[in-house]
């Protein structure tokens, strides 16, 4: 198991209203040549390990934002998702320094003092190696629905605001995330989003990727898959712990044509009321957030976003709680699920990255298919590389299952157990490549998940999760 090294806290001076390019600039991101993954501008694979911090710009001081970002950098998160025009009265409730984001509810009149604070947070995140997944606005500002609103966007001012943002953050390490938890319900909604995207492109010259954050149990592909500005699909598979009817949709987006990368930008949060019904179902725990990590990755996602129910809203006891957070954000950042996300990243990065594909046929269907590959919370999923040098099977529960050994090309197969709870790998043995073989996880508890890793022995890959 590798040991975490906390990154040094870099003090970043804000020398102008517009962030300036410096030696610490993060490389821009682009879509890989096979259209399945993200890579840096020099072609290195990029693992999206995101955290939802929707109210970061709106509610946090620089000191608290810095502490939060340092925590996430130490846990090897690579993206933080935050909103410029925030959800919770973001147009009328000022930020921690008393500044509103725009004047007169007019997106063409941004408040420089508010955005100087955004500048500072973006620069601090970038200095720590974290990209900001920047939402120009939460969705209630263009489709009020259940939010506070008001609806302030038109196609015309959305384009102007987008271009202004694009110019301001042209050199920053960001990804643009349009939308904000709202559906497209008419042509005007689509025109607003499209205009904002085109404005961003004009402003930053195409420097940054663009996606769309949809409402629950939906994906950007529903409305925008064929649009040129949409670089990759983002899903919100939602706050359910069930694979069936939720996380199975990641592979449906993976299979769409034309090919575009896909990521789950909002799965079930840790400590969240399960399916929004705490009285009946309680709150989610670490195992509930680990499962979607592997379900999504092994279904073809290029990364994954985590969230904690207290952290996204940066709840403290002096604030009105939204949907029953369990603890203040300062405590919630230490919840176990957050630390366990990095083990999924380490596992994927320890094997060839850009050739990975989902392959459920690695798993032998049990006599009772609802047992293996299973349904609900207990779905087994598998992935491998196109050269058949390795395969991985995620077992969400300690249940015996069988695999096709010839999913691997080598004559001899080295097998490992990888523990998603602590990132350790244990060698099982070396086996001939023939027939089907049953494996039983080391522990058989309900919340004790495991990953079986099968390697072509001749490749001499390091232990799963180890850095090359």
Cite the ranges covered by each PLM segment.
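Active-site mouth of glycoside hydrolases
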Residues: 26, 31-244
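Bacterial Sec-dependent signal peptides at the C-terminal "C-region" and cleavage site
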Residues: 13-25
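Extracellular glycoside hydrolase catalytic/binding regions
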Residues: 160, 167, 171-174, 180-333
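Bacterial N-terminal signal peptides that target proteins for export
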Residues: 1-8
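Aromatic- and carboxylate-lined catalytic core of secreted/periplasmic carbohydrate-active enzymes
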Residues: 44, 261, 270-272, 285-429, ...
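Short, ordered beta-strand-loop transition motifs
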Residues: 30-34, 384-388, 431-434
